[in-house]
């Protein structure tokens, strides 16, 4: 029997930024963690900034996504994002600095509501980059991280 793979496409405003096949795609949607395999029921979900793991056989591509929307059909996963980076291209020091800057901005007592929302978004994105880096190294992260 021939093994069936999901088609996976990650699309940004620049076009397709990742194409591949997968046994399983793991990501966090609006309802929580999801593992999507061939034959999955159709769904549409929002995605927070986070990690997408695309596993085919023994290889896993670890991707950072800035947030977006995932569309699932029984044979395909399409993820629409503003930004995507492969974990191996992320810089740990830069992500840690971005996280520290965002945390500092959140402590500013004179910050406007808009500034606080922007800093919160930057903090979520920096945390997601760090999670992607850790995931690519085989390090565990939890929902609380």
UniProtKB/Swiss-Prot annotation:
Coiled coil: none annotated. It comes from the Bacteria. Pfam families: ATP-synt_DE_N (PF02823). It is found in: Cell inner membrane. Gene3D superfamilies: F0F1 ATP synthase delta/epsilon subunit, N-terminal. One of its GO terms (cellular component) is plasma membrane. GO terms for molecular function: ATP binding; proton-transporting ATP synthase activity, rotational mechanism. Its main location: membrane. Residues 93-104 have a biased composition (Basic and acidic residues). HAMAP family: ATP_synth_epsil_bac (MF_00530). Belongs to the ATPase epsilon chain family. This is ATP synthase epsilon chain. It comes from Francisella philomiragia subsp. philomiragia (strain ATCC 25017 / CCUG 19701 / FSC 153 / O#319-036). The lineage of its organism: Bacteria, Pseudomonadati, Pseudomonadota, Gammaproteobacteria, Thiotrichales.
């Amino acid at each position: 029997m021939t093994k069936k793979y999901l088609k996976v496409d990650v699309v940004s405003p620049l076009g397709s930024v990742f194409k591949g096949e997968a046994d399983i795609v793991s990501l966090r949607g609006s309802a929580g963690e999801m593992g999507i395999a061939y034959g999955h029921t159709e769904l549409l979900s929002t995605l927070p900034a986070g990690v997408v793991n695309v596993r085919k056989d023994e290889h896993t591509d670890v991707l950072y996504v800035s947030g977006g929307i995932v569309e699932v059909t029984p044979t395909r996963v399409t993820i629409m994002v503003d930004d995507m980076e492969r974990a191996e291209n992320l810089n740990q020091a830069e992500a840690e600095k971005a996280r520290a800057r965002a945390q500092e901005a959140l402590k500013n007592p004179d910050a406007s509501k808009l500034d606080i929302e922007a800093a919160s978004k930057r903090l979520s994105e920096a945390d997601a980059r760090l999670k992607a880096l850790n995931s690519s190294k085989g390090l565990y992260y939890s929902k609380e991280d």
